[in-house]
């Protein structure tokens, strides 16, 4: 059978597929001939940044991925971590940045759908979702439209599918004007002895297509996700996928039912690069070839070419290697759920990826070189430059109370209620903590006391100032947020969003952030078990803020002892665990400097990982023993914002003692490794004794009570006034009534 080609391969065609001249030469040397148009599309999909990680692979190997609880680390659809009693949590975070900018509703919706498939492909039932969203400046003409579409897409898919959204982030910065970020996280529960993998095994076994039919939506999506944007962005709208959450719900139930029959040898969801990537990954991992007959692929559009079928990113589809004797039983399950079930190929022993279409062989390629032996680059990067510290006399002053009121009602520090009230946070009936606290918490169904905590974190302005410290801080804050609920942090997933890696200064950000993330994960016993890299987040040469989002999972052994951020009662002591001298001192890169004075200079705060570990373990023990009544991590906005958020959540005021140092640094400094905790009067002595034994500074800095917040010698601000400011910004902005400078 001869290889059929339908289109001449020209330099322009090669370039339009995102392949560099040296990569095309590598293809010619690899296969010994000119590729067909379909083969060119396959190489483009598999060798692009989105699928091959060719610029990041070298550095990702530096991350710790193993631990006593890790069942499966990176390399599968999702990470798997043991949570005792024969149960495990399966989770991952992935980006859908480029599609969401072009078509916000469908881009965000299919981002949620894709991450849910990654989880249930492993045999887990999804129990929680989060999303970390970054938008451009609020006064940019597209921002309101993008926020509306993305939030509706996230909610529309997640709500219909039936998974609670328990946490996330929403932030604004002009650096995201041309490239928003939509990072979707999902977690599911499974039995530790019933995990399903994507590695194909056995020769001559049927390769089965499952789920929805294939259309032209998403053709070239993975290639688009590996390129910068320019003026032709609107032309890329057809490359955005279209999702159907109700079909995905049926696919979930059908897959989990099928998995109980013993029919599944290997299974892989069709995400980026669709049928191409799923088939190549299954075969390459198992050292097997794959032959596909595209005439047997269920399609919903007429006259689809082999190129379109191989690169379509139509949603709600799976590929499976099946035990032949289970074919009828498996087919009956999918027919019952109204889904397609078609044997579209077989495994082979020749390590070839062979595609047949209308009697022609349209592709015949070496499968290993397409998959796990794709090109790998060691791109040049520049040494890191650390900004000079701010001089003591270079800290601009402001009224402490006025600054607090402005910050709680600002774009980046106000309540996200407008967002999360569009998400179903309670479906499944296991949600214990909803968005707005330090972490979302979900009860483990079937267990009397066990719960899981989830958080996603990164502070891009820190990463921009110092990628190494910023990488450490993203991990530390995620670990701290989990700890603040009483959870033992188990493991993390990363979503590394950066600009163009071909620019040495951007590659430097990536390299140093990875080094910081790796060091923090090792110090905190918080391995990375899954993740995603999203590069080329640039428009016309303007890159985003470096945004390595960390999503973490923690285990709460007894959710009755879980901590919350809201003050529990009046007349309780407020203590600052991990307090530096003077309550706070690091004002550079703070939201105070950015949002009150418009300054983003100076170094990021240093993260002392030994201190972080010591304080976090101490606070977690206090929570487990019922010695504290409220806990909140101290991060963006410093002590002032932490106390204000605790007051707003509870309706109870607070009085904080006047610091001995500069009140601006004390209240708005963003020193790391700190928790605000409250303790009832009858427990103070016990807590102080523990702190003394542990060698931990735990000063009493104030007291709860009243209906206002007073910071040192500043004027009081009523809790109602704080709450009104906190709740007003988002609905006012989305209603179109907000002045741009707010």
Swiss-Prot record:
Mg(2+) 2 binds at residues 118, 269. Substrate binds at residues 95-98, 117, 241, 313-315, 534. This is Phosphoribosylformylglycinamidine synthase subunit PurL. Monomer. Part of the FGAM synthase complex composed of 1 PurL, 1 PurQ and 2 PurS subunits. Pathway: Purine metabolism; IMP biosynthesis via de novo pathway; 5-amino-1-(5-phospho-D-ribosyl)imidazole from N(2)-formyl-N(1)-(5-phospho-D-ribosyl)glycinamide: step 1/2. Gene3D superfamilies: PurM-like C-terminal domain (3.90.650.10), PurM-like, N-terminal domain (3.30.1330.10). It is found in: Cytoplasm. It catalyses: N(2)-formyl-N(1)-(5-phospho-beta-D-ribosyl)glycinamide + L-glutamine + ATP + H2O = 2-formamido-N(1)-(5-O-phospho-beta-D-ribosyl)acetamidine + L-glutamate + ADP + phosphate + H(+). One of its GO terms (biological process) is 'de novo' IMP biosynthetic process. PANTHER family: PHOSPHORIBOSYLFORMYLGLYCINAMIDINE SYNTHASE SUBUNIT PURL. GO terms for cellular component: cytoplasm. Belongs to the FGAMS family. The active site is at 50, 96 (proton acceptor). Part of the phosphoribosylformylglycinamidine synthase complex involved in the purines biosynthetic pathway. Catalyzes the ATP-dependent conversion of formylglycinamide ribonucleotide (FGAR) and glutamine to yield formylglycinamidine ribonucleotide (FGAM) and glutamate. The FGAM synthase complex is composed of three subunits. PurQ produces an ammonia molecule by converting glutamine to glutamate. PurL transfers the ammonia molecule to FGAR to form FGAM in an ATP-dependent manner. InterPro entries: PRibForGlyAmidine_synth_PurL, PurL_linker, PurM-like_C_dom, PurM-like_C_sf, PurM-like_N, PurM-like_N_sf. It comes from Sinorhizobium fredii (strain NBRC 101917 / NGR234).
């Amino acid at each position: 059978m001869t290889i059929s080609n339908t289109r001449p391969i020209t330099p322009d065609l090669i370039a339009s597929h995102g392949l560099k001249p040296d990569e095309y030469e590598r293809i010619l040397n690899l296969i010994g001939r000119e590729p067909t148009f379909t083969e060119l599309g396959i190489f483009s999909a598999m060798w692009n940044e989105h699928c091959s990680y060719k610029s990041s692979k070298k550095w990702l190997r530096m991350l710790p991925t193993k631990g006593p609880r890790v069942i499966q680390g990176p390399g599968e659809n999702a990470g798997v971590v043991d949570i005792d009693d024969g149960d495990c949590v399966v989770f991952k975070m992935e980006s859908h940045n480029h599609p969401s900018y072009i078509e916000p509703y469908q881009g965000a919706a299919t981002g949620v759908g894709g991450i849910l498939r990654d989880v249930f492909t492993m045999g887990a039932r999804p129990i929680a979702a989060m999303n970390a969203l970054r938008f451009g400046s609020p006064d940019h003409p597209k921002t309101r439209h993008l926020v509306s579409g993305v939030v509706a897409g996230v909610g529309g898919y997640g709500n219909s599918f039936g998974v609670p959204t328990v946490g996330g982030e929403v932030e604004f910065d002009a650096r995201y004007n041309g490239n928003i970020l939509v990072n979707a996280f999902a977690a599911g529960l499974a039995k530790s002895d019933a995990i399903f993998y994507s590695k194909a095994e056995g020769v001559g076994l049927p390769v089965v297509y499952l789920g929805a039919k294939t259309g032209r939506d998403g053709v070239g999506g993975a290639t688009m996700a590996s390129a910068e944007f320019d003026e032709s962005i609107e032309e890329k709208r057809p490359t955005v996928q279209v999702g159907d959450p109700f079909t995905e719900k049926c696919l979930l139930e059908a897959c989990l039912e099928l998995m109980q029959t013993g029919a599944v040898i290997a299974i892989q969801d069709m995400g980026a690069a669709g049928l191409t990537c799923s088939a190549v990954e299954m075969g390459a991992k198992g050292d097997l070839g794959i032959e596909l007959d595209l005439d047997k692929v269920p399609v919903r559009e007429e006259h689809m070419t082999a190129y379109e079928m191989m690169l379509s990113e139509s949603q709600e589809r799976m590929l499976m290697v099946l035990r032949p004797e289970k074919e009828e039983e498996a087919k009956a399950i999918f027919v019952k759920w109204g889904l397609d079930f078609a044997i579209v190929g077989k495994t082979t022993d020749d390590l070839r990826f062979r595609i047949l279409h209308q009697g022609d062989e349209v592709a015949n390629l070496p499968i290993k070189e397409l998959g796990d032996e794709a090109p790998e680059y060691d791109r040049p990067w520049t040494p890191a430059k650390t900004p000079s510290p701010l001089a003591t006399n270079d800290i601009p002053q402001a009224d402490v109370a006025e600054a607090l009121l402005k910050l709680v009602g600002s774009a980046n520090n106000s309540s996200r209620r407008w967002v999360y009230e569009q998400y179903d946070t309670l479906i499944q009936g296991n949600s214990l903590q909803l968005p707005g606290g330090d972490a979302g918490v979900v009860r483990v169904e079937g267990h009397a006391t066990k719960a899981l905590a989830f958080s996603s974190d990164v502070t891009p302005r820190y990463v921009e100032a110092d990628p190494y410290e910023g990488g450490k801080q993203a991990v530390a804050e995620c670990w701290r947020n989990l700890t603040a609920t009483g959870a033992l942090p188990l493991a993390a997933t990363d979503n590394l969003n950066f600009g163009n890696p071909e620019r040495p200064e951007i590659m430097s950000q990536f390299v140093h952030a990875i080094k910081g993330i790796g060091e923090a994960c090792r110090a905190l016993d918080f391995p990375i078990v899954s993740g995603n890299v999203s590069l080329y987040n640039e428009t016309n040469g303007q890159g985003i803020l470096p945004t390595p989002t960390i999503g973490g999972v923690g285990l709460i052994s007894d959710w009755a002892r879980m901590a919350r951020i809201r003050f529990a009662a009046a007349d309780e002591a407020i203590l600052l665990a991990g307090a530096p001298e003077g309550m706070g001192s690091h004002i550079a890169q703070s939201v105070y400097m950015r949002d009150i004075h418009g300054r983003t200079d100076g170094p990021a705060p240093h993260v002392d990982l030994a201190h972080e570990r010591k304080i976090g373990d101490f606070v977690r023990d206090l929570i487990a023993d019922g010695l504290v009544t409220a806990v909140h991590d101290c991060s963006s906005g410093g002590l002032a914002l932490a106390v204000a958020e605790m007051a707003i959540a509870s309706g109870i005021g607070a009085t904080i003692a006047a610091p001995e140092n500069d009140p601006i640094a004390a209240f708005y400094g963003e020193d790391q490794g700190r928790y605000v905790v409250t303790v009832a009067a009858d427990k103070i002595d016990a807590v102080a004794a523990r702190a003394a034994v542990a060698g931990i500074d735990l000063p009493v800095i104030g007291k709860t009570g009243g209906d206002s917040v007073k910071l040192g010698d500043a004027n009081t601000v009523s809790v109602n006034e704080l709450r009104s400011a906190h709740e007003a910004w988002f609905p006012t902005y989305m209603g179109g009534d907000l002045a741009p400078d707010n």
